[in-house]
Amino acid sequence: MLGCWWLGYQAGFGQELPDKSLFIALYSLSVAFFMPTIALTNTTAFTILKNNGLDTVKDFPPIRVLGTVGFIAMMWFVNCAVWEDGIFSLTLADNAHKFQYTYMQFFVSGILSIVLFLYCYTLPECKLEKKESKVSLVESLGLNAFKLFKTRQMALFFIFSALLGMCLQVTNGYAGPFITSFKGSADAAIASSFAANNATLLTSISQISEALCILMIPFFLKRFGIKVVMLMSMFAWVFRFGFFGVGNPAMPGVIMFILSCIVYGVAFDFFNVSGGIFVDQECEPSIKASAQGLFMMMTNGIGATFGTLAAGEIVNHYCQWENGFLQGDWTTCWFIFATFALIVGVSFALVFHPEKKS
């Protein structure tokens, strides 16, 4: 990330990057190293909790919520931080030098990565299990987790994880550009609205909702089970996209945006966090870490890839760049995404029947 920042800094504010390929390579490399840490942190947390005799369903969510708190803090910071002519400031007013629009966001990401790197040395040790028998190459690479696909329940779980990963990628990739696109509206009230000029701050409501919903997971999992909890997530995605489709940044349309951000907490947590707990409970100790990696691969790997490609085709068909904003028939796009989430939810309800445990 610091490399991406340096390339942007060298090019100068508002200038085109001279070497786009190097920028993409550095960014992709950074993301490639980051993505496995999601599964790794889940596995580490579950291991430490169990080593200390704690309940993962009850005690993991309050820990996980701190990650969301950090997410919110950085969203607010990047939304408001400005670096202009060597002077740092914070503002809610529209400013082209805000970190959210410039290479400075990569600088923040790089510095935080170094801080987290150092923090990892303070974590409790998670000892590896030593096996008396010779470990195969498949086991060493963690590929033995793929045997979970032999079980119908886990195979369906991972398939639907990928489908929900597509939904997550849609909102990750297009929520911000969609809201910001209203700055190019012919309606002055919409173009100058607070929401259109502070998309990152507005969407942080999603993370606030996420933080609150994480704390509800223990109750819902124990009361209703994984199937109902995941169904709540799937239908929350329907509302997430649907509210975007009917809203706009000005009053009263912005209320729809706020509602979309609120239901995001259920859409994300009741699948991603609950799914991680479900995988930990269902898998044997020897493959728990690999299974978490497989879960992340299905959601943030396969699901995200197909989600990016499919959503890109849809958005490119209905929208186009005009005056620096991605404008067009966004309503149709969001309704298509909502329909997809609805089909996934109904299909999941019909085919996924997890075993009930006493």
Label each residue range with its predicted role:
Residues 1-17, 235-250:
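C-terminal ends and interior cores of transmembrane alpha-helices
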Residues 8-11, 112-125, 332-358:
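Multi-pass alpha-helical transporter architecture, strongest
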Residues 35-53, 270-284:
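Intracellular juxtamembrane helix-capping segments at the cytosolic ends
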Residues 80-111, 313-341:
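A membrane-interface helix-boundary motif in multi-pass transporters
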Residues 82, 212-226, 315-316:
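Helix-to-loop junctions at the C-terminal end of transmembrane segments
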Residues 123-157, 184-186, 191:
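Juxtamembrane intracellular "pre-TM" segments in multi-pass secondary transporters
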Residues 227-275:
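C-terminal transmembrane helical hairpin of 12-TM major facilitator-type secondary transporters
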